[in-house]
Each structure stands twice: as structure tokens, then as C-alpha cells.
Amino acid sequence: MPDSMMDMEHRDHQLHRQQQQSHHHQPPRLTASTSTFAPPAPAGSQSEERDRDRDRERDHHLHHHQSNNVASSPLPVTASIQLHQQQPQQQQQQQPLTQLQQPQLREREHHQQQQQQQQQMMQQPQQQQQMQQPQQQLPHSHHALMQQSQQQQAIHRAEARRADEEISDKASTCGKLLIFLSVALVIMTLPFSLFVCFKVVQEYERAVIFRLGRLMQGGAKGPGIFFILPCIDSYARVDLRTRTYDVPPQEVLTKDSVTVSVDAVVYYRVSNATVSIANVENAHHSTRLLAQTTLRNTMGTRHLHEILSERMTISGTMQVQLDEATDAWGIKVERVEIKDVRLPVQLQRAMAAEAEAAREARAKVIAAEGEQKASRALREASEVIGDSPAALQLRYLQTLNTISAEKNSTIVFPLPIDLITYFLKTNEATTQQNARAAAAAIGNTPPPLQLAPQQQMGQQQQPQYQQPQQQQQQYQPQQQQQQQQQQPQQQDQLYQQGQQISSAM
């Protein structure tokens, strides 16, 4: 509908321009009733005729557009009749309107429609929010109150600044007067005023100057000579060297409910002399108190084993916290170190007992591992000695050398191994002979009386017992001969070993 209205306005404007051009360029027309030349109509009548023609054309377009809409939409017959009845009434109302009033009315109507649409669009999301989030009204109201309070605070601050500026303007005149008087006083007492006006600051110091209670522009002065005016200037010396502070022992309850006493040392220095004087009353005292509280807070969030094993980490966290807190005071914390952690006596005893038990268990494990390794070594040595008798002889000689090296009054001289082996061999031979003799005696006993078949069996078995006896008789002279041959060799070996031992001693 707004597009059709715009088209109609455009067409009306074009028709109006065409009519103006036709009135300017066309000659006067003759009427149909008479053949005489009609006089030109006045300007007011012409404008009224143009307005009527334009209104008729507009009404015609409106009627045509409404008829199209009625044909396209399924309206009832009564609605179409009402529309036809309303059209002449609208035409009668619009005819007396002038050419300047019609566009104004249209613009007003269009503007009102736009405002109504915007209001509807703005009300829809608000209604949705109220339906969906009814519980968020209190936070919004609280937020609005906070904003109002912030605005009021900003207004008060602005008013205070204005008052300060007014006071400063008034004081500036007095300050200028006092400065002029002090300069005049210096000039009048020139030889003596030099001792009062010139000051010296060391390399590690800075001077913060106040003139009439305000900081001088340019920051702190120094090192070297600086100038002050008497009676109106004052200054404060600030030492920039690093200072140490021993934090006294602090009783702290750890996270696992153990009471410990912890002390530390803090290294800090003044990084900004002006800020350290202007922002805090006593920067050094404030830093020391803050170090104590930071030590308590940091230790209270740790377990006992963390305090004992992670001292470097705790020191680093304390250094960062102190540095951030003292930055507004012009203080730079360079380092923090934990000195000592004192535990209660009962806890020390319990920890000592636990450590001792752990050490004993560790020692037992080590001893068991050593015995296991020693048994393995002895087993390997016995296997080697059993495989080669010469290794046993060498071991015997080594023991003799170690015994002879000791400075003792009594020397134990053990028997030679060869002699021991000889006795062992003879003992084995005698045992074997006794066993064989017993077997032979058993074989020579007569069998008991039995039946004929058993006697036959006894006769068959008799030669079996006689065979070992014959073998023993043959073996005994051979063994005796071997022993007789080995005796001189063994005696020679024993004699040589005795000489070696005597020479070693």
C-alpha cells in the first residue's frame, strides 16, 4: 500500500507539471456553446481546476487499485459496498485541501506509521525477555542502582575537582607572592643564603622537594647539588640502596594441621623515590609488616612435606606477591629466602624414628643382597676348586703367606693338604677292604640243608661267590705296590713344601 501511494504521488506530480506546461504554451480554447473567443480564466480559477483534475485522477487510481484488491482478496459483498460508499465521502473531504497541505498530511501519516512500527518492534523483545526471564528483574534493578551510584560518585568527584581548582587558583596567587618574597630574601642575604639554599645529595640518594606543600615538577633531585628556597621549600632524602629485613619467626598452622615456626629474610629497595614518599607514610615499615603476613599466608596453604622440600618454590611465590603489592609504594622486592623451619619436639622424635626405621630396613636389604652375592661367589669358587685340585693347593699357600705376614708371637702351622689327602685315601681304601672282606665272609659260609633242587641251585651259585674272592686276591698285591711307589713321592713333596714355608718365614 505505501508503494501504491508513492506511485500515485509521482503521477500527480507529473500531471501537475504537464498541466502547467500546457497552460503556458497552449492558446485559449473556444467553448462548445458559442463561437466567440472566451477570455482567459483568472489564476485562482485555473489552480482550482488543476487541483480538481488531480483529485479526480487520484480518486480514479484509488478506485482502480481498491477494485483490484477486492477482486484478488476474498472479501464479502458488504465490505465492497462499504468501500464504494466511503470513497465519495473521502473525495468530498479531500477536495477543500490545498496543494501545500496534502503532502504535509501524507508525511505526518507516514511518520506516525513508522513510529508505531518502531514501538511495536521495541516492545516485542521486551515482552519476550519478561516472559522468559522473570527472575532476572532483581539483578537488573541492582545493576541500575549500581550505575546510578557510580554516576553520583562521578558527579561528586567532578564537583570536588572544581572546588580544588578554585582553591588552587586562589592559592596560586598567594604562592607567587611568597615565592617573590623568598627570592627577595635570598638576594638580600646573598652571601649567607648560599649555605641554606644549596644542598648536596649522594650517589645512592635522591631528594624529593615540596614547595608550599606540593611536589616540585621534574621528580626527585640528585645526585649532586640542588637549590631550594628558604621558608617555602622542604625536602626528604630517600636511600635507594638494597635493604635486608629478617622476618621474625612466625608460628604457622600448615594445611595438614601441623604447627611450625618459620623465619625468612627479604631483600628490597626503593625504585621510585617520589612515590615512596607521596603514596605511603613509611614505606619500609609497611613492607616489613606485609612480609610477615605474606609469609603466614603462604605457609598456611602448604603441607609440611612441601614446606620442607620446596623452599625455592615458596620463596619465588612470596617474592612475586610482595613485589606486586609494594609496586604502588615505589618498592622493588628483589629476593625472598626461607631461613629455617622449626618443628615441635614430639614431631621431631616421630620423624627421627621413622627415618631410623627406614634406614634399618634399607641396611637389611643391602646385607641380604650382599649375602646372596657372597653365597653365589662361594658356590662358584667351590665348583672351580672341585674341578682343579691345584686351585685348592694355591689357596692353601695364600693362606700360609697371609699368616706369616702377621706379626704374632704364636704361629699355627697347619698340616699339608697332601698328607690330609693321603690319610683320606687310605681311609677310603680300608673302608673298601673291610666291605669286600665282609662280602667274602658272607660268600664262604655253607648254605643250609635243603631239597635237591635247592642244593642244585646252591651249587650253581657257589662259583659266583668265589669269583670276587679271586679278584680281591689279585687286586690286593697291585694296590700295595702302588702305595709303596707313591710314598716316596709324597714324602718328597711334603719336604719341599716345608722348605718353602721355612724360607717364607
Curated annotation (Swiss-Prot):
Residue ranges, compositional bias (Low complexity): 82-104, 113-139, 451-505
Annotated keywords: Membrane, Transmembrane, Transmembrane helix
Membrane topology: Single-pass membrane protein
Main localization (coarse): membrane
Ranges that cross the membrane: 178-198
Gene Ontology, cellular component aspect: plasma membrane
Biased composition (Basic and acidic residues): 47-60
Effect of N297D: In RNA edited version
Source taxon at top rank: Eukaryota
Disulphide linkage map: none
Compartments where found: Membrane
Protein's UniProt keywords contain Aminoacyl-tRNA synthetase: no
Family label: Belongs to the band 7/mec-2 family.
UniProt name for this protein: Band 7 protein CG42540
Organism name: Drosophila melanogaster
